[in-house]
Structure formats: C-alpha cells, structure tokens
Amino acid sequence: MQTSKLNDRLQLFASVGVLIGLALVAYEIRQNNELARADSVRVMLEGWQRIALSEYETDITVLHVKSIREPQNLTLEEVGKLSAWLTNVMNQYMLTFAMYDHGLGYSSGGIEYSPGDELAKSIDYYFGGRFGRSWYQENRYWIDAQIVEILDRELAARPIQSGDSYLENIKSRLGVEPVAR
C-alpha cells in the first residue's frame, strides 16, 4: 500500500513537472518570436537607413536629379550606379512586403504602416522621371507581383516628372515659394 501511494505521488509530481516544463517551453517560444520580430524590423529599418545614407554619402543624389532633368546626358557609368541604387530600393521594398505578408509588420505609436501606402507615396521620388520609369519597365519581370500591381496603377495615374516640374512639385509640398525667373 505504501509503495502504491508513493508511486501515485511521484506520478502526480512528474505530471505537474511536465506541465510546468511545457508552460516554460511555450513562454520561451513566445519570447523568441518577439525577438525574431524585433530583429526583422531592425533589419528592414537598417536597409532603409542604408539607402537614405547612400543618397548623401555618394553622388547618387546628383545622378538622380540628372536622371530627372536630363536623362539623355547620363553616361553608362551613371546609368549603372542609378540602376544599382534602384535595385537596392526595390529589393528593400520586396523585403518590406514579404515581412508584412508574414505578419512582421511595423507599427509605431499605434499607427500601422502599410508598405503599399509607403510605396505609393515614394513613387514620384524613385520612379517619377523617365529614367526611373524606364528602369522599372526593364526590370519588372523579377519584381514581386503585388509591387508591380501598385506601381502600374500609380504610374499610369501620374505624369512623368521632368526638369523643373519635379523640383517645383517637391517645393510646393514643402511649402517653399517658387523662384521667379
């Protein structure tokens, strides 16, 4: 009888131990998921930061303006640099869309960011000029279908930015008075 009671108690303690262990494993998995989510968001934001910094640390800004104002005067080397820059931008958009598709969206202050909205807002900057649109048309075959759909819709509804109109649009959005000529 004594061994039967002892056996029952040991079995009960073992069962409780297993339940506690399972609870700890579930907690650890949840914690690891949150860490993975935070790391994914960090990687995404670092990618956008690298793109933004590259515009100021290299001659990309000058080339980008030249690609809008006088795309016919771009050299082969300049076309290569701009193409590499736009490829990085597009890869970053594809990473951002993939993260959102897998539930790894980014929110701040209760505001959920939509990659589609962000892409639509930045189309004039990256793809508003003749060079940007041409680059997109030549490279759309490897771009995610969801992004192609947004770009096609938005580009069809917007005029091609050229020369001063591009800079005037930016100035008007910033509230800067146009310069009299």
Regions found by a protein language model. Give the residues of each.
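Amphipathic alpha-helical "stem/stalk" segments
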Residues: D8, Y27, Q31-R181
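Hydrophobic membrane-insertion alpha-helices, especially the h-region
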Residues: F13-V25
